[in-house]
Regions:
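Acyl-donor (CoA/ACP) binding surface of acyl/acetyltransferases
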Residues: 3-55, 85-194
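Conserved GNAT-fold acetyl-CoA-binding loop/helix
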Residues: 53-73, 84
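Short loop/turn motifs at secondary-structure junctions and domain boundaries
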Residues: 77-81
Length: 194
């Protein structure tokens, strides 16, 4: 078994740990565990991705096939890059309540690291998205050595914009993306090494 531990501290009381245990990345916060997904996460993932309310920023709920493809894409990202969107679970119960992580996205003819997050509706307004996103921001800068991280958020998704502000990101641009047959305006948020 390969075990290593890295302690990453961000200003204030926030301390996050990353562990690599048997090649499965884990980030821990006070209330959350952020881990790689596996095929056994398909059902809790489907509960999130197939909810119209959660997925409005993506143009609506995913089908079963789109959900499976989404999970497969994350598993490929882990294998190819060592990161992607991870499962976010409650420390006390182990319940998967959302996803958060870092993916590579196209922006202004560049490929940039983006922090993304999606949470089950029953777990909104608890600060979980900001807690997980801050852990991912720390990981992206301290462990993956990105100098700048982005969040590209649909202009109508005010809740996600608030999360970006809470983790220290600021708007830098507005773009239009074509996704699932729709043109959608997005705000590009970013944060660099402080």
């Amino acid at each position: 078994m390969s075990v290593s531990s890295v302690r990453v501290q961000v200003g204030g009381p926030h301390v996050f740990y990353s562990h690599k245990v048997m090649d499965r990345l884990v980030l821990s916060t006070a209330r959350l565990m952020v881990r790689e997904m596996s095929p056994s996460d398909l059902l809790p993932l489907a509960a999130i991705l197939q909810d119209d309310g959660v997925m409005y920023a993506y143009g609506g709920a995913f089908s079963a096939a789109e959900t499976e493809a989404w999970l497969d894409k994350q598993l490929r990202r882990y294998a190819e890059l060592g990161f992607g969107l991870w499962a976010v679970c409650l420390n006390d119960t182990g319940e998967m309540i959302g996803q958060c992580g870092i993916t590579m996205q196209e922006y202004n003819d560049l490929t940039v690291p983006e922090i993304g997050y999606l949470f089950a509706r029953g777990h909104w307004h608890n600060g979980y998205a900001a807690e997980a996103a801050m852990a991912c921001r720390c990981y992206g800068m301290a462990i993956l050595h990105f100098n700048r991280l982005y969040s590209i958020i649909r202009i109508t998704n005010v809740a996600s914009q608030k999360v970006a502000f809470r983790i220290g990101m600021r708007p830098e641009d507005t773009i239009v993306r074509h996704y699932r047959g729709q043109y959608m305006r997005h705000i590009v948020f970013s944060a660099g090494i402080d």
